[in-house]
Amino acid sequence: QVRAHQPINTDGSINLEAWLDHAVSVDLALDREALKEACEFARASEQQANAAKNLWSEGTSSFRTGLEIAEILADLKLDQDSLVAAVLYRGVREGQIELPAVSQRFGPVVAKLIDGVLRMAAISASLSPRQSLVLGTQGQVENLRKMLVAMVDDVRVALIKLAERTCAIRAVKTADDEKRNRVAREVFDIYAPLAHRLGIGHIKWELEDLSFRYLEPDQYKQIAKLLHERRLDRERFIADVMNQLKVELQAT
C-alpha cells in the first residue's frame, strides 16, 4: 500500500516545499517548479472558493487529495502532465477550477487528461446502489467496465482515476455508512478489476481489501482472523525449526 507523504506545518497546513522535495526524490525526472505552480494554483483555488475541508470524510479536501493522487502516480512513474492533472483534478471536479483555465495555464494535454477523468467519473456514477456485491447481473457490470476501457484513449486517464478512487476508499473510513458503502461498491465492482487489467497489483489488492472490509465486515473479520491464526502457526513452525537447527549446530 502506498501511503500519503504529506508533511504538516505546526499550524496544520501542508508543508508544500517538503512535499515537493519528496515527490521529486521519488522521480528525478519531475519538474519541481512546474509541479509547485500546479500545487499553489490548486491550493489558492480551494481557498478562494472557501471550500469545506471534508471531501469524503473529516479532514480531507480537494487540495490534499490532489497531492495524495499525485504521490500514487509518482510511485507508478507517470509523467509530469499526469501529476499536474492529478493535483488539479479534484479542484475541477468540485467547481473550484475551470477547465479552460487549466488548458491556458498548464497546457491542453493536462486539460484533456482531466476531462477524460471527468468522463470516466460520469459513466461510473451510473452504478446504482444495491444490496449485494453484484449490481443486476455480472454481465451488466462487465459491460460498464468495457465501456470505461473503450472510452479511454490514454491509459494515463485510467491511472489517474484509479489513484483518485484509491484515495477515496482510504478516506471513507470515517464517513457515514451510505457514503462509505457507495464508494466501496463502485471500487469493488469497477476499479479493482480495472487495476487488475492494467497489471497494477498493489493497487488492485488495496482496493479489494478496503472495499470488501466495508461491504462485508463480518466476513472480512472472519477471514482476517483465519489469516492471523495461520500466521501465528507459521511463526511457531519457523521458531521450532530454528531452535532445532541451533541444537543440531551446537551438537556438531
Regions found by a protein language model. Give the residues of each.
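Active-site helical microenvironments for divalent-metal-assisted chemistry
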Residues: 1-252
